[in-house]
Every structure is written in structure tokens, then in C-alpha cells.
Amino acid sequence: MFFKKKKNIPDGLWQRCDGCKSVVYKKKVEEKHNVCPECDYHFRVSTSERIDITLDKDSFKEYWNDMMPADPLKFMDRIKYKDRIISEQEKTKLNEAATVGKGFIDGKEVVFGITDSSFIMGSMGSVVGEKIARAAEMALELRLPLIIVSGSGGGARMHEGAFSLMQMAKTCAAIARRQDAGLLFIS
């Protein structure tokens, strides 16, 4: 009896689809912008992948990345809020759930924002609200289109209490000012 020598196949070539459970070639998934070639299931797209897919190559300039959430309530559930933030930053390589800045789409300048559900479910805390409001204000001042890709699902961030609830009013007011000016807003 003859046995063929087993070939070494590098890791990361294949992935299982959460939709149809098929094992699919990862390169095919990437070619379809993280969509399963078998069933059209949409895989999660990270912040950096979404920026790369949406904006012209290397055109994104991030703003306000140094903003860090405060812990005014000294909130604690299973762990302290400040420790949760550190853990989320290490896990996601993001400072917060929102990333905003300017970039180009087909050579046209836009203000671009994205919220990432992998960072505390993309919930809106004080930093997320401030970044979105500033992005809307910058787009209004520069008279640029504002595009926000919302990966949020977490609502207001309970760890910051009323501070996070106030962000909804702040962001809505900033976006309303843009709308009143008749500028393009896509979300």
C-alpha cells in the first residue's frame, strides 16, 4: 500500500460561512468585498477594511484620534469601565467605536465616519458623539458631503449614563444644521 505525502496547506486560505456553513476560499470572499460566493452572506467588515473599500487608496486622514473616553460614573459591571476600554482598544486596535476624517471617493473630497460594532457594540459614548458631531460640523464648514457608515447596534453606552444619552441630541443637531444647508448626507 502506498501513501501520498500530505501537502502542507497554509493557514487562512479557507473560511466557514456563517450563513450557509460552506467552506469557501477566502480570496473569493475578499474579491466579493467580504460576501460569501455561495449564499451572499455578508461577513463583518472592519473599520480599516471599510475605509479601504469605500475611499480612494491612501486618501483617508483621520481626525480626533487622541480623544479618549472618561469614566465620570466610575462605572463597574463585571469589570471597571476604564479597564473595559483598555481591553477593547487592545482587542480592536481602535481608540473608540467611531473613526472619522476626510478622504476622497473617485477624486471627490468627503468627510467620512464609521462606527465599529466590535468596540463595545459600536455604542455611543461621549467620544463617539463628539467625533460624529465634529465631523458633521467640519463637513458643514467645508461644504463637503458627509458619509457615515454605522456599524452600531449598542445604542447609548450605559457606562457613561446621561453623558452618553446627551450625545444623541448633539449629533442630531449637528446633522440637522447640515441638512438645513442642503448638503449631501449619506448614512
What are these regions (language model features)?
Residues 1-186:
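Terminal-region recognition feature
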